[in-house]
Amino acid sequence: MIREVLVEPQHIVWLPWIVNYFFFVGVAATAVFTAVLFAKKAQKPTACEQSAVLVAFIGSIVAPVALTADLHQPSRILHFYTDFAWWSPMAWGAIILPLFSVAVAGYFVLTLAHNTQPNLPKWLVWLNLPLLRSQGLLWAFRLFSLLTAVGIIGYTVLETYQTGTRALWHSAWLLPIMLFSAWAVALGLTRFLVRSDERSVSLQILLILTALSVAGLAFSSETAQRDFALLFNGSITAYLTGICWIIALVCSFSSKNHRLQWLGVLALIGFGWWLRWVLVIQTQTIAKTNVLQNPYHFDWLAVDGGLGIVSIFGLAVLVTVGVGQIISLTTQQEK
């Protein structure tokens, strides 16, 4: 019986840009879920809801930039609209993503308007408009954001699942893995911004559910078991993912130690990002038709490598600082 087919090694198609996109858009979408869960009827947005919306807003800005960089030619986006392919998840994503960004931006502005101080800088006085403090409008944008967030999770998972070329992609376990891992990061960032000293059982549950989902994926079929084992062969990324998961889980039990809070948040971010790297990039190195592994050289100085990753996270920091300054201007007390 012929067990191998001699073929040329295949170069990977998805580059690190798509990992950044899946990470930030996943965190943004699940942060919306978190915000809506913290929402209370006929009341101003709580601190937890505001923090979750802030996380979603930052992610909704950074994620499209990473996706545009992955396309290399921004003008290619127009083809999704001029030649709409209803069967393609990417075509639907071209519609859902802009709607999601608009919804989250509106949600963020409305939560900001509900908690502003009377004396605002001239360029921010429009936040005091009575319309922006309407509970009905706020709930409308909560629902708008929630629906588009569900669409984001659905299309990003389906985009990977529909390829059907690899056992680790074409699996129902992909949805809970992407959902729970991103939600853990979103919840962890929200709690960190609120500076909560209470132990988060929800965060621990999400981390455990992610681990169980990964185990379910690994043992879903013989091919998946083989491919999953190859991910640990000669690569440190899969081990880094596991280490970050352990650190994040341990730190979640020590919420009153601020140093451990910092470590826990960094571990959560590392876990969520590395998990997507392993599932998206590392999985592509596993050959589909022979026992060899496809080559992939990571270049730290390349735009499609380390430089691109650092630039996207740098953009996230820049957006965080800028939005943080706006929040401080709108909520500062009158002297």
Residues covered by each model-derived region:
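Long, contiguous internal "core" modules enriched in hydrophobic/ aromatic residues
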Residues: 22-24, 41-44, 106-278
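Extramembrane terminal tails and long inter-domain/linker segments of multi-pass membrane proteins
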Residues: 1-12, 81-84, 118-135, 285-335
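Membrane-interface transmembrane-helix boundary segments in multi-pass integral membrane proteins
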Residues: 12-22, 91-94, 225-247, 283, ...
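N-terminal signal-anchor module of multipass membrane proteins
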Residues: 1-41, 281
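Alpha-helical transmembrane segments of multi-pass membrane proteins
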Residues: 1-2, 63-71, 153-156, 320-324
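Transmembrane-helix bundle segments that line or gate the permeation/cavity pathway
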Residues: 23-42, 52-79, 92-119
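Hydrophobic alpha-helical transmembrane segments
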Residues: 23-33, 98-102, 182, 242-249, ...
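Membrane-entry segments of alpha-helical transmembrane domains in multi-pass membrane proteins
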Residues: 10-26, 45-52, 83-99, 133-143, ...
